[in-house]
């Protein structure tokens, strides 16, 4: 999905 921060994918 979208990466908002390192290791944070939705």
Swiss-Prot record:
Iron in keyword set: no
Positions in coiled-coil regions: none
EC number: 5.3.1.1
GO molecular function terms listed in the Swiss-Prot or TrEMBL record: triose-phosphate isomerase activity
Record GO biological process: gluconeogenesis; glycolytic process
A GO cellular-component term linked to this record: cytoplasm
Main location as per UniProt: cytoplasm
Catalytic activity, reaction form: D-glyceraldehyde 3-phosphate = dihydroxyacetone phosphate
UniProt KW keywords: Cytoplasm, Gluconeogenesis, Glycolysis, Isomerase
Domain of life: Eukaryota
Miscellaneous comment in the UniProt entry for this protein: In plants, there are two types of TPIS, cytosolic and plastid.
Similarity-based family: Belongs to the triosephosphate isomerase family.
Subunit and partners: Homodimer.
Protein name, entry field: Triosephosphate isomerase, cytosolic
Origin species: Nicotiana plumbaginifolia
